[in-house]
């Protein structure tokens, strides 16, 4: 992997610059999306071609920056029903292409605004294949992703921030992302593709769910 890669930088964009630095001092320049800020985490990859909202909100990605291999992200927008957790624990997201405008009847908010709402720093315009190959061969590295309007990044500080981050080894992430209190789910709902979930008074089945941790 080259020490510095600049991908798709000639394409005009309404978004601000962004950057990803890895613990081996590799630098990826791109276009920032979502929340403006800086986040450090373990850089992993996901090969799914659908379900990006479910992936980003999946608590198993706590502390990680997700590199999506599928290039077209954002085409179905986001909604209130597809989150996998009440809080999004993912540190950041990386896409190859600029996010697509939503075209789906279930979409309530476009992905960029959803990322802002959940304070997730995002980056587009990267060579995600190169990054995926690196992760495949070397393992998931520590990395820092940053997105600021001025587009001037203190690279040395970002590298130091990355190297100082202890990583995920040995952490009890299940304890971190799990609910702190017991609760009983009393919702009686039906679901249709036109209207989504709706409350109902009809009781068709008795269901028991056991969580073994």
At which residue positions do the language-model features occur?
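RNA-binding accessory domains that recognize and position tRNA/RNA substrates
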Residues: 2-213
């Amino acid at each position: 992997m080259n020490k510095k890669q600049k991908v798709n930088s000639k394409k005009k964009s309404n978004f601000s610059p962004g950057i990803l630095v890895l613990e081996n001092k590799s630098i990826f320049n791109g276009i920032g999306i979502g929340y403006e800020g800086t986040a450090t985490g373990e850089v992993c990859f996901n090969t799914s071609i659908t379900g990006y909202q479910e992936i980003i909100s999946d608590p198993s990605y706590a502390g990680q920056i997700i590199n999506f291999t599928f290039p077209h992200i954002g085409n179905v927008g986001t909604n209130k029903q597809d989150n996998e957790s009440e809080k999004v624990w993912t540190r950041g997201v990386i896409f190859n292409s600029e996010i697509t405008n939503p075209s789906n009847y279930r979409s309530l908010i476009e992905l960029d605004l959803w990322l802002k709402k959940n304070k997730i720093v995002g980056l587009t315009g990267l060579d995600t294949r190169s990054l995926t190959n690196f992760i495949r061969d070397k393992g998931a590295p520590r990395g820092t992703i940053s997105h600021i309007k001025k587009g001037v990044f203190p690279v040395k500080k970002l590298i130091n921030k990355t190297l100082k981050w202890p990583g995920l080894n040995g952490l009890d992430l299940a304890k971190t992302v799990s609910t702190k209190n017991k609760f009983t789910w009393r919702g009686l709902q039906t679901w249709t593709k036109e209207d989504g979930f709706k409350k109902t008074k009809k009781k068709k089945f008795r269901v028991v769910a056991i969580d073994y941790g």
